[in-house]
Regions:
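N-terminal cationic and glycine-rich segments that engage phosphates or anionic surfaces
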Residues: 1-116, 121-125, 130-139, 210, ...
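Positively charged, low-complexity, intrinsically disordered RNA-binding extensions
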Residues: 139-240
Length: 240
């Protein structure tokens, strides 16, 4: 009995991991499909598609899945139509949220997002009432951090490639640029032989909001619940 019980728990745990992995793969494939539909199937000419493919590869999405997702985006007829949605909201403590979705059912996404936010004591906001608190950037995260004698030379090269800001911490360097310059900046990083830990489009808060410990835990729980929704691809907040 003990052996059976232990195996049952192992299977439950593995099943939960497999389900989470499958949901992640679905989200990644949807992002690829939408990116390909928007600006074509060539990553060299479509920075957003390139970013989506890079994220998928890092998450070990199989190559066949990536190719099918691209074809789904450019194929058009007969395919389930996906659309992008962006929700703006306020969480407890006045924390601002931006929730990005890729979905085949607008009503489902709206209901799911609204339900979680209102249950947490927050509220959906009108378009533009939250995004003004953020800046939209392309971000290349380089690891390890850029340092040493050639740091100034490297940073100058990044500025020439479109970098608007370069931030360093103990583990790496974040290079920020206008979204339209992300592909060029990513190429510059690669040409210099540096390791790009991730290449992303991000909403970055202009000013962060301090919360009490209790409110902070509430907001963090809400963020995790939103990210777990099948249709949600990204969640951003201005919580410090």
């Amino acid at each position: 009995m003990a052996r059976h019980s232990k195996w049952h728990k192992v299977r439950q745990f593995k099943g939960a991991i497999d389900a989470k992995r499958s949901a992640s793969f679905t989200k990644l494939a949807r992002e690829i499909t939408v990116a390909a539909k928007e600006k074509g199937s060539d990553p060299a000419m479509n920075a957003r598609l390139r970013v989506a493919i890079e994220r998928a590869r890092k998450a070990s999405l199989p190559k066949d899945n990536i190719e099918r997702a691209i074809q789904k985006g450019v194929g058009g007829a007969g395919e389930v139509q996906l659309e992008e949605l962006r929700y703006e909201a306020y969480a407890p403590g006045g924390t601002a949220l931006i929730i990005e979705c890729v979905t085949d059912n607008r009503n489902r996404s709206t209901n799911d997002v609204k339900h979680l936010i209102t249950d947490a004591g927050g509220s959906l906001a009108s378009a533009g009432s939250v995004t003004y608190l953020f800046d939209r950037f392309g971000v290349v995260r380089v690891q390890p951090a850029i340092d040493g004698e050639k740091r100034d030379e490297i940073e100058l090269s990044f500025i020439e490639a479109g970098a608007q800001d370069i931030l360093h911490d103990d583990e790496g360097s974040d290079i920020r640029c206008a979204p339209s310059e992300l592909a060029v900046l990513a190429d510059a990083v690669q040409q210099m032989g540096l390791h790009a830990e991730h290449i992303e489009f991000e909403w970055i808060p202009k000013i962060t909001v301090e919360t009490t410990e209790d409110v902070g835990m509430q907001v963090q729980e809400l963020l995790e619940e939103l990210e777990a929704l099948d249709d949600v691809s990204r969640v951003y907040s201005n919580m410090a």
